[in-house]
Structure formats: C-alpha cells, structure tokens
Amino acid sequence: MITQRQNDILNLIVELFTQTHEPVGSKALQRTIDSSSATIRNDMAKLEKLGLLEKAHTSSGRMPSPAGFKYFVEHSLRLDSIDEQDIYHVIKAFDFEAFKLEDMLQKASHILSEMTGYTSVILDVEPARQRLTGFDVVQLSNHDALAVMTLDESKPVTVQFAIPRNFLTRDLIAFKAIVEERLLDSSVIDIHYKLRTEIPQIVQKYFVTTDNVLQLFDYVFSELFLETVFVAGKVNSLTYSDLSTYQFLDNEQQVAISLRQSLKEGEMASVQVADSQEAALADVSVLTHKFLIPYRGFGLLSLIGPIDMDYRRSVSLVNIIGKVLAAKLGDYYRYLNSNHYEVH
C-alpha cells in the first residue's frame, strides 16, 4: 500500500505523462505537491521500486509503468466522470438525421473514434435478450423467398433463402404457421432451445420429409444469434498495438464475446489495463460502458486504445457519448411508437 502523498505523486505523473508523453521530473511535481524536491524524489524511487513507475532512458524523469496505470485506474479513476467541455462537441456531432437504429450506433462509434484517435466498438442489445415480435414469409419467385423478422417490435432482420425443391406453397404456409405458433414472442435464447427440442417434433406433424425443413429453420434463424457490431477506427490500432489486434478486429463476433466478458455480472462500466483474456487485447486498454437502448435493454460502448491513454478524458467521452446516444435513441423509439402525421 502506498501513502497518500505517493498516491498524489503517481496520479500527477499519470496526468502529466498522458498529456505530454514526456517523462516527469520532481521539479514539475513540486508545482502541485507541497513537499521538497528531495522528498518527492524519494517517493518516486519508492514507487519505482514497487513497479508503479519506470525510468526513462533519455532523461532523469519517470513515467508510469503498465502496473502504475492499472493502480491509477483501480484507485483514482472515477468511471462516471464527465468533462463539460466535451458535451457541446458531442451533441453537435450527433446533430444528424437518422433513418434507422444502425445509423445511430455506427455514427456513435465513429464519433468516439474520431474524438480519441483510438478504436471504438458498439454492440446492440445482446442477441439472447431480444424477442421475436414479428414474422412473415414473402415469396419472391418460384424458387426463392424472404423471411422478414422483427425483434423487440422495432428491429427488422431479413433472410433470403432458396425454397427447398420438394416444397409446395402450402409448405411455406406451414413453415410460417409453426413459427407464429411456437416461436413468436419468444426470446432469441428460447428460440435456440426450441429449435433443438420442440420444433423437430412439431415438424413431423406437418411434413413427410423433415431434414430439409429443419435445415431451413436453422438457416433462417441463425441470423438472430449473431451480434450486431459497429467498429470504427480499426486502422488506429496499428498506432498503439501490433498487427494481431488489427486482425482480431475483423472477427466481429469474437470481438463482441471478448467485450462482453470484460464486464462482470451487474457491472455498468469497467476499465481493463493490459488485462484482457483475449491475447490480441492483452497489451492494450479496454474501456467498456453499458448504455440504455430505450424499450429494449442495454447496448455496449467500448474504447480500445494504448495503455498510456488519457483515461480521464476517455472515460468522460465514453460517458457523454453513451448518454447522448441513449437520448437520441429515446427520441427515435418514441417517434416509432407514436402516431405519424405530416406537419405542414
């Protein structure tokens, strides 16, 4: 455990270093820390011995080690902090017309990436928690059709498929009827379970040959089990990490799994400093924050960047963007649920 003065010194070194990326000497600390230069140097030496500070090769100053940044995050960083100077810029960036949910999530991801210079990832509500609230089949031709699904009464998902060779028109009607009777109003996780248990038994009552029918069910509904992921600033990862991080960001489903695992049960926000279970994220920092998607649940807003990032500003931007995005989504869903009328 370090003393209060040593904690203040570490915090100040972290603050100064993340602003300038230059080693910090005792004279720079004396302007804020009410102690002699010798006392400050002695405390810096103790912090270095504890592995929280590192010597610079080109100067007598010190800089935070990865362990030092982690200590700062765990003991001094407020995860709910907001810098009012950033509020105006975020609100201004969100001043655009959105025609669908994906527009807003993609825009928010770009805003966070552009304002930090790092990589941002936004996830929609976890698939397992969404509900199937609408289903229809539109026959496009003699040989293909379109399954139109609605999640949470607002999110459309479409899957085009080739009609099985042995299907007649009545078979498509039966397919739709089974979905409406057994799967409609179920959560996605329940649909996954029913496709393995109930549906095979039900299908036998409607179809003589069931193999291609069960394959059709799997094909149509597999889309529901995928995370909706929006990545921005992927190329920025090359400035603070190696190629493995850049390549990992291409695997959006695995990215989503890793980010969800970074939050413990019941947590609304977390900061991992070189502490991810995923090897491609093991040498970076990951900020993760839940934001409200009204009427549906929580999305996930994440920032991936270097260990020596400005944590206070990064946390502030994540918080502000999360709040502004939630407000924008609230307006969007209220509009969808209201009576539409034209204003002249």
Curated annotation (Swiss-Prot):
InterPro entries, per database record = GAF-like_dom_sf (IPR029016), HrcA (IPR002571), HrcA_C (IPR021153), WH-like_DNA-bd_sf (IPR036388), WH_DNA-bd_sf (IPR036390), WHTH_HrcA_DNA-bd (IPR005104), WHTH_transcript_rep_HrcA_IDD (IPR023120)
GO BP annotation list = negative regulation of DNA-templated transcription
Is Hydrolase there in the keyword field?
Answer: no
What's one Pfam family here? HrcA
Which Gene3D superfamilies does the record cross-reference, listed alphabetically? 3.30.450.40, Heat-inducible transcription repressor hrca homolog, domain 3, Winged helix-like DNA-binding domain superfamily/Winged helix DNA-binding domain
MF GO annotations? DNA binding
Alphabetically ordered keywords of this record = Repressor, Stress response, Transcription, Transcription regulation
Repressor listed as a keyword: yes
Entry function: Negative regulator of class I heat shock genes (grpE-dnaK-dnaJ and groELS operons). Prevents heat-shock induction of these operons.
The record's annotation in HAMAP family points to: HrcA
State the family named in the UniProt similarity comment for this chain. Belongs to the HrcA family.
Q: NCBIfam families recorded for this chain?
A: hrcA
Protein name per UniProt: Heat-inducible transcription repressor hrcA
